[in-house]
Amino acid sequence: VGDKNQAIYGFRGADSNSIGMFEKRLKNGSREISHFPLTTTWRCPKSVVSEANRYVADYHAHEDAPEGNVIVRAAFTPLRNDMVLCRYNAPLVSAFYDLISQGKSAYILGRDMTAGLVNAVKKITSNNHMGTEEFWQLFMADFEFNHAKLISQDKVNQALALEDKKECIAIFTDKATTVGGIISEIKRVFDNNDEGEIMLSTVHKAKGLEADNVYI
């Protein structure tokens, strides 16, 4: 089940043309193909669907859906049970620190981020006492090498994912004085058992979830 508009895992190699490729290969194998359009959303209000139609056609709200409200450039004032979505992780980390500084309870969905970020730090050094300035110089040299390699191989989505990881680690580096401190900050932000009043999440992790108020 899927369509050309659902390649939300592009950073993992998802292809928006995957369904088309399946269809082509099945037809070449003399298989009969049937299409069953799923163009009605039972989850989104009409105003949200109307906004989505600017980018995705043939997508409709259920006739009983509430009208809802889309506010462009709304003030960032999320409250309890609100959801904050972003395509990448780094802006979520910044938003997390911003909300915490305001005394609000927030969490970033996806504890699986912890291992990847910690490993990216440990890949550079196992010395937890190393200062952040020295660490950052070594980290950036490694980043630039691997980023250039991905670009040369035309792996754009993977390069963007690497950029996002770099931006995340940059934020944590600014919050610490040593490598050990960076790792502690990563674990503090992501190892909170997904508990809090305001949920921050990347779009792909939030698939299937809903909230009355969503900031994008």
Show where each model-derived region lies.
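Short amphipathic beta-strand/extended segments with alternating polar/hydrophobic composition
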Residues: 74-76, 169
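Core RecA-like ATPase module of SF1/SF2 helicases and allied nucleic-acid translocases
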Residues: 86-216
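Conserved helicase motor core of SF1/SF2 NTP-dependent helicases
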Residues: 1-72, 83-102, 107-119, 195-199, ...
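Terminal export/targeting leaders at protein ends
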Residues: 78-80
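Short, intrinsically disordered/low-complexity patches at protein termini
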Residues: 72-74, 131
